[in-house]
């Protein structure tokens, strides 16, 4: 009899401690393969391997392309590759980044949902923004079980809270109980298989690097008057997405909050560049005014002095906007 033998776990900020707890508490005879993606800098992947290997009793492996996975083993995402499942093998995809990261939690979750449906248990841990919420929703749509770490105890509550809202999670569990809960759920028979929605299949193919282009994207998204921060292409609004998401023609994907965060960074950078240019312009025109005075051209000097004062006013306005942006609360 089949069981829930695929466990996928995702997290980012503040997720290392609960992950260690889960791995320490998973039963050594758990009848499931465990796949983990944490959104970390590339250099953090090695640290994750060390932490995971020393945390529990299950063998831990760095995922490689084509690797056949086994129950009772743990597999970690590789740097700069999406961790994807295909049948009983692992695929490493070089498709576009999602929320500016690769490997992406959502890509792993979708591929598990596509190939293993109700046999999947998805878990979202502590983290910022809404990474993992879309993938958890895909697992739910394919008949799998969805779990989030209790946001009240998470170091960064956004990810589990957004996942709760987007996927109507089956369970909300403190980290101290997750290992035991997963071990017990893995022994249960899965529910009935549900039809696979075309958008889930297509987005898995995009993550694998197999499908790109605006014509393909038109099947799942409508054009939006927005620009991709990564490539400058046109973004499209993914239809009926929970949470709201966007993809560009190249395939870069963003939840609404991740896109807003990237836009804020671009606005801040643009304002700072504008401030530097105007400050330099004021300095140059002031020097031209001084040169006019030295050379007996008072009218020219006065004109340049007035212009320099105008530029300084513009610079002060931009400087106030930049300083105000630093005081805004994180969103």
Please provide the spans of the model-predicted regions.
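Conserved acid/base catalytic micro-environments in cytosolic active-site loops
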Residues: 1-290, 313-330
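Short helix-adjacent coil turns
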Residues: 251, 292-299
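Short, charged, amphipathic alpha-helical segments
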Residues: 298-309
